[in-house]
């Protein structure tokens, strides 16, 4: 995980926001990755679409390997997904989606959130895209959604002068600051949707 590593093993980045003294506890939460054994499409996406319908609409957030789950859910139940937030997604697959699928995403507010130190190694198998490549891919994905007249944004804290966030943004010391930024974005989308609904009633 990029911000748990520094310029060399055992030395975290000076500005890291992750509580490095807790890394051992984090590692104990790990379980074997069994995603390769799942059927395709991933049954979690189907379950999310059912849950969204039961709730009569939901705002979906995905992180890391599950980062794209909101997108898959939107394709199954586009009218039940109110907004999508992808936190450090494993990939935005910018060149995989068809124009028709992009058109679906363009109808739902979308936010991608990425941390810091994109040039750090991932320590994943050779050939796996690095952090910068993943970030660039999400930027291209956002551009495609915007080109289709969608509301899509990238929240990259370093651009706002907020540095040191890790892959586990929700556990970082500045997690509440990032949460506030996400909440403000979501509030803005809610206000925009209410404005459109009000305009239709006039």
Each model region followed by its residue ranges:
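Active-site machinery of serine-nucleophile hydrolases
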Residues: 1-37
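The feature captures the conserved acid-bearing segment of alpha/beta-hydrolase catalytic domains
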Residues: 89-157
């Amino acid at each position: 995980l990029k911000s748990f590593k520094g310029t060399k093993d055992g030395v975290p980045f000076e500005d890291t926001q992750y509580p490095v003294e807790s890394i051992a506890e984090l590692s104990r939460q790990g379980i074997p990755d069994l995603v390769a054994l799942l059927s395709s499409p991933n049954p979690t996406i189907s379950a999310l679409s059912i849950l969204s319908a039961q709730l009569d609409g939901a705002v979906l957030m995905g992180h890391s390997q599950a980062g794209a789950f909101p997108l898959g859910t939107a394709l199954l139940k586009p009218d039940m997904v109110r907004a999508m937030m992808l936190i450090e997604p494993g990939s935005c697959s910018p060149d995989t989606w068809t124009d028709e699928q992009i058109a679906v995403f363009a109808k739902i507010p979308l936010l991608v959130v990425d941390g810091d130190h994109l040039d750090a190694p991932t320590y994943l198998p050779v050939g796996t895209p690095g952090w910068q490549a993943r970030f660039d891919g999400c930027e291209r994905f956002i551009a495609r959604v915007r080109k289709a007249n969608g509301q899509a944004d990238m929240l990259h804290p370093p651009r706002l002068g907020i540095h040191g966030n890790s892959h586990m943004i929700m556990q970082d010391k500045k997690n509440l600051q990032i949460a506030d930024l996400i909440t403000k974005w979501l509030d803005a989308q809610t206000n925009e949707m209410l404005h459109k609904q009000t305009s239709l009633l006039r």
